[in-house]
Amino acid sequence: MATRLRGRWALGITPRNFTWILKDKLAICERPGGYGENHRRVRRQEEIIWIRENGFGCVVSIIPAPHNLHNYDELGVAARHRPFSAEDLDVWLKSFYRELHELLRAGTKVVVHGEEVGDRIVGVMGGYIRWAGLVDDDTQAITVTERLAGRQLDPFARNVILTATRLR
């Protein structure tokens, strides 16, 4: 059963580098609690509480290992583990985009996290924007994604966006 808190911590804390991709529908963030030496158990719990209290219906983790997935369950948040695979990128992207599209079409508010909010996760989200037809032009999709990220994308991220339409 989900733990319910009272008082000033009842709403949790916003996950680090939380960024809306599609306002009130799809967001990205750093792994709740941080990663590596910066990982903190209490911070993880507070960030998962924030995700729950802000109505996210599903967390999708793209990190390689299934770390902390049980914490979502303990706090009453649905989670899916979809480890990013660069080895067969097109197959992974096609499957990921279809699943994400179905979640969003069903009205589920989704947050996707990697270890950090870097070009990998930003490129994957920019690719989704293009794949879903939310932006009609490759160059425009790159520009929109760079605005969301607040910086220029690396070649990997740009390539994901450029190849997204052929994955439909």
Language-model features: where?
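Short glycine/threonine-rich catalytic loop with a Thr-x-Gly-x-Asp
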Residues: 115-122
